[in-house]
Amino acid sequence: MKEYQQSAKYYDRLLAPFIRPIRYKVLKVVKKYHYKTILDVCCGTGDQLKLLKKHGFAGEGIDLSEAMLAVAEKGKEKVSCFLEDATQMHYSDAKFDLVMTAFALHEKNHATAQKIVEEMLRVTAEGGDILIVDYELSEKTSLLSKMAIYFIEWLAGKEHYRNFKSYIKKGGLPELLSATPLKEVERYYFGQHGIVVLLLRKEGR
C-alpha cells in the first residue's frame, strides 16, 4: 500500500476533525450492544480501536499498510493491529460479535470490495453485527457535500479516484450488500447526507 506511506504520518491529524463525530457514533453503537469481540477491517492508524479501548472495549484490527500500522503502534492507548489482507483473513468462521470497516470499500476495485464483504460476513458470528462507514450519495446529499467528497477522492490519487467513481456508479453499499443475508438494524448520516454509518445483522441463509 505505497500510496499511504506519505499520508500515514498526518492522516489522523488532517482528518480527525471531520471523522471524530463518526468515531463517537460508532462508540455509541458499541456501548449500546456491548460487543465482546470486535474486529476493525482496514483499521488504518487504529484511531477507532483506540477510542473504543479508552472506553473499555477491546478489539483488534488488520490493515495492508505498514505505514498506517506503524502509526497505530504509537500513542497512549495500545491496540492490537496486524498486517493482513482483508480479502484473505486468517480468522476462523464466526469469530467476532462485531466486524467493522470505515471508508475502505469505496477505494477498492469492485471485485476486491466484494471479497472483503464476503470475508467480513464469514468471520462474523451468527446473530452478530457488521458495521460499515462509507459514502452514500443520493438526491438527499447536499451539492456542497458531493463536491467536497469528489474533491477529496480526486486528491487521493488516480486509482483511488477511479475506484471511488466506479463504486458510486455501481450503486455503492446497497449494490455491494445486495447478495448478503444481512439485515439492516440502524443507520445514521453525516456530512450533509454524504456519509452513512450502517449497522447490519448477520442472519442465517
Segments predicted by a language model, with ranges:
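Conserved class I S-adenosyl-L-methionine
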Residues: 1-33, 47
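Core SAM-dependent methyltransferase catalytic element
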Residues: 180-182, 186-205
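C-terminal alpha-helical "lid/dimerization" subdomain adjacent to the S-adenosyl-L-methionine
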Residues: 48, 133-180, 186-187
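A conserved beta-strand element that flanks and buttresses the S-adenosyl-L-methionine
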Residues: 100
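Class I SAM-dependent methyltransferase SAM/SAH-binding core
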Residues: 39-41, 45-88
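A short glycine-rich, Lys/Arg-flanked "PGG" loop and its adjoining helix->strand segment in the class I
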Residues: 114-126
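Short catalytic micro-motifs in class I SAM-dependent methyltransferases
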Residues: 103-104
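Nucleotide donor/acceptor-binding cores
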Residues: 35-37
